[in-house]
Amino acid sequence: MFSELINFQNEGHECQCQCGSCKNNEQCQKSCSCPTGCNSDDKCPCGNKSEETKKSCCSGK
């Protein structure tokens, strides 16, 4: 599991966020480069969780 997260960071994934709290979450923004126009849930392809919702803000897609 952890190696997958490291791979995501190393591969420079494109981050297509459907953001709720993800776009307001510093850690998600750092890892994911979430765009500011997000208005949906909090998912983007990186390994973090939203501090607010405790849900994954990222998916492995």
From Swiss-Prot:
Cu cation 3 binds at C17, C22, C34. Residues 40-55 have a biased composition (Basic and acidic residues). Coiled coil: none annotated. Residues 1-8 form a propeptide. GO terms for molecular function: antioxidant activity; cadmium ion binding; copper ion binding; superoxide dismutase activity. Residues 37-61 are annotated as: Disordered. Protects the cell against copper toxicity by tightly chelating copper ions. May also act as a depository for copper designated for the effective transfer into the apo forms of copper proteins. This is Copper metallothionein 1-1. The lineage of its organism: Eukaryota, Fungi, Dikarya, Ascomycota, Saccharomycotina. The gene is CUP1-1.
